[in-house]
């Protein structure tokens, strides 16, 4: 029973973690450039085309679009879906390992790991020279 509970909880938390990872991508992309997190809505940085709902699904959209913008065919860095997927796993894994037995501890562990990883990523990005590419 606990195994099924753990797996179902992890299956719920995996896409939630990927969505949080996608949001953290936006934060790390926009904040250093002084852009708002709310406006304009998600868009291609090259052609400025607003992304549709089906282009906003973490990891799956990247695969469906073959890693390119639908508007201008600009390549989307491979690091984006990797970080989104790892964010999903980071939130889901503590629950899969025993979340139903210790739900609060599993959620706190997953959230702390996720935040820690993204804080480290933000520090790494802040130390990267402004002109270098980010994938």
Positions of PLM-derived features:
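A membrane-topology feature that recognizes alpha-helical transmembrane segments
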Residues: 1-135
């Amino acid at each position: 029973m606990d195994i099924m509970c753990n797996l179902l909880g992890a299956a719920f938390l995996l896409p939630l973690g990927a969505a949080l990872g996608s949001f953290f991508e936006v934060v790390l992309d926009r904040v250093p450039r002084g852009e708002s997190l709310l406006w304009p809505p998600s868009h291609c940085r090259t052609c400025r085309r607003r992304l549709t709902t089906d282009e906003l699904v973490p990891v799956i959209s990247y695969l469906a679009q073959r890693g390119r913008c639908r508007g201008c065919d600009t390549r989307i860095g491979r690091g984006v879906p990797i970080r989104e997927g790892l964010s999903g796993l980071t939130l889901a894994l503590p629950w899969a390992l025993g979340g139903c037995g210790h739900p609060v501890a599993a959620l706190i562990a997953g959230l702390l790991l996720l935040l820690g990883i993204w804080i480290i990523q933000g520090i790494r990005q802040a130390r990267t020279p402004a002109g270098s590419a980010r994938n």
